[in-house]
Amino acid sequence: MTDGLERLCRKLGYRFAEPALLRHAITHRSATKENNERLEFLGDSILNFLIADFLYSGFPRAQEGELSRLRATLVKGETLAELARELEIGDHLILGLGELKSGGYRRTSILADAFEAVIGAVYLDGGLEACRKLVSSLYRDRLETLTNEALLNLKDPKTRLQEYLQARQFPLPDYRVSAVSGEAHDQVFQVECTLNNTFPSVIGIGRSRRKAEQDAATRALALLLAENEDMNV
């Protein structure tokens, strides 16, 4: 194993049984036909699975849409490129001459792809548990930060609105079904959320009373936050 690959292994905290896999993972398509694109494809799928698994365990109250948004934040190209920079993957990339001259080793897309390829290489070399351990280590700080920031956002809109009002000693909101339309099996509910005499009532719409109330609460909270921003200008 070359000195460069040794340094990268130390950064990763993982030693390859087959160093050729790591070399393959850092070889860009501009350098040779035998490049990291297939490993990138594999690593992308494994990374998405592992992050989904971490989030599923860490956010037991989160709904599917919320989990998807959290995962998207953790696997987007900018995040992967940041991780690649922390590992100094760019220093070891094997690039074609043109890509090297144009600074490809700094390019977000190339770094993100190489990071995914490294994940794929670790999977082929050491299996899923080796990958899980590596991803857990690399993402530890981000997962902890995300957990702290996301706990409030994972609360349902009615809870967030109630807590916002209580913190300011405002009256609690009142929800009233103002209209129901559609057939019995396909009804649409309209709910009116009344805050107090200072703010106008807000209308929410949903396929159930609960969803309409949540929609109304979301709109009411947005109104309150916008009003608060205007007062602070």
From Swiss-Prot:
It is an enzyme of class 3 (hydrolase). SUPFAM superfamilies: dsRNA-binding domain-like, RNase III domain-like. InterPro entries: dsRBD_dom, RNase_III, RNase_III_dom, RNase_III_sf. GO terms for molecular function: double-stranded RNA binding; metal ion binding; ribonuclease III activity; rRNA binding. It comes from the Bacteria. Keywords: Cytoplasm, Endonuclease, Hydrolase, Magnesium, Metal-binding, mRNA processing, Nuclease, RNA-binding, rRNA processing, rRNA-binding, tRNA processing. Digests double-stranded RNA. Involved in the processing of primary rRNA transcript to yield the immediate precursors to the large and small rRNAs (23S and 16S). Processes some mRNAs, and tRNAs when they are encoded in the rRNA operon. Processes pre-crRNA and tracrRNA of type II CRISPR loci if present in the organism. Homodimer. Belongs to the ribonuclease III family. This is Ribonuclease 3. It comes from Nitrosococcus oceani (strain ATCC 19707 / BCRC 17464 / JCM 30415 / NCIMB 11848 / C-107).
